[in-house]
């Protein structure tokens, strides 16, 4: 599978205030995947920006960094209300997966033990890979792995995870340099 980049209109885990303007200036780039977080913009503005992305033929992603079930459900409902194609993030809950499936939305939950703000990823590579396999058995078809937030070796984790898991994989977590972007294409 050819790697793709998702342009996230965020800074320090918050959607930038001028996300709509930035997208309008960049919408003709040959980048298919665009998104932002559920924090930083009011919901009506999120809906407007997501709509502009879709009108330009882009696939849209909302990333939600929450850990309790109620907050994860709220983030899922926001993604649905705003018309996103994918919800990325949230700790996996059956209720979130069910809501998204009922509304025809793709779901890339976090994998491994994610906590804190900014988020960190804990667990051995083997535990994280097994967590993904367990979620795939429940019907999950892709993951948001915060490799560069891993407490040990994010690059090694990303390589091992991609080799072991046959699913859509979004490697995330501070991919904020050309060197890290190049590494993603190498993996």
Give the residues covered by each predicted segment.
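Generic hydrophobic/aromatic pocket-lining and core-packing "Φ" positions
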Residues: 23, 50, 76, 97, ...
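C-terminal alpha-helical cap/extension of soluble enzyme domains
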Residues: 166-187
